[in-house]
């Protein structure tokens, strides 16, 4: 009998009887007990499946090869008696006469480079006190996300992190680090605690393929948006990638250390595609887990060669199982979906519902990029900005409208935004402040659906963007007083807006990548956090620190109630100034009965009229901590410095 063509597989997988016959709700992957381990693999199109066992994760002798037995719903299984912790294995799956060696799609541990799966007793990977680790209790007004790569966080020798831990999970556990070990200027975890961000978003930490874990890392670098094993931590971030249990333990230690500091952990998840099509999912059930064009070839909405078919029942189940695994076994506090527009809205809502079913699960954040990376075969009900109304109100989106309004478009280096004086952009600033709840452009179910930001790992850093707009040939390492003022203004806008504030690590100390807009595989030196800049630009760091604390002191800005932005009172001001007042909610613990905020994106001082009453100056264009002590009281009129956000509190 002739082998099926890719188009024939597509027809089969889009046939409802196939799903009815083969949908499976029982356990999959390795089920470990001290007395033995059961391996279960969903492979409904397979003619035969065998497992090969190894003592090591790479090389070494074969311990044996055994056949699996096919059961109901296309599930193959085998019982391996005796102690199996630390045993490595691969499957050989035969489909249409072609046999492919593969790892287990449900594996929780792996050998070097993730080629061989590993049976693991998770209890043995728990760091000391893990059973007492709990998610930090973070109020909505305290929420702010700081995005960083594990590698970038501590790669810089100036970080004060011990050499063996630089660029590793364990760097997050080292206490008391300072710049060059000077004992004065905090770095890494010590720095984060002082800054006041309450969530760290980690760029991909599940096992990816673009870094060879068996080789030194000095010249290797990649962000990691090229996953291989979705339920296994990345090995290059561990101190020993050859031992499968080490990466699990050290990843958990990192999370526990952040929790102990009162900081939640958001995981950047990239289920939308895999690094290559020869991966455990496609090797096990060819073509099932990935969308296909009419001719059966792989659809490429990710721009990376394939895209995950979240709408297919067992693919959706895999997605939900994996998310729940990380939430339960790693105590993850939030999930950021890369290219969320490549998922169907029903699947994303199902993920939200599954998280909500966990103890404390309603506090787990869920947001993503509401766009795609190319033309997709998912033509309706995408989890994108156009379908925001279809998403659960606690599924958020990165708001490029806010980003581009504040700092300018991200694809044209020289296109200005509001802070650089773009004409007419002030109209969109009002929309951004209200998290677009008072606009017909989106609108969201609730302000908390909007991730307000001006920089992330993609595109230019904020500092580089500001300099590109100002100069035809920027000097990215030069100090620029106007760009610094514009940086403060940008922060002053999104940190006083409704929604979830988000920032790229180092935005608060003028991080530069010297004009490189896509550094996903640039040098470690270019991508690392330059901790010397945190000291050189300490006044900018302090400005962010003060704004974060000020925001937390006025809880209404963090409201998840869709009606909250309706209380904003915008002033009729001379263009391009923007001003607004927001009353506090009685009894919410706000430090002031109202906030009054003005933005001035011009190069001249401007005078505005204040609402009736007395107003304490809380923050101006250079200091965001005036509210912490005695400050001037204003009535009538006030002057706004050039390129400034000025904040008053009613007294």
Regions found by a protein language model. Give the residues of each.
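Conserved alpha/beta catalytic core and glycan-binding cleft of carbohydrate-active enzymes
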Residues: 120, 352-353, 358, 362-505, ...
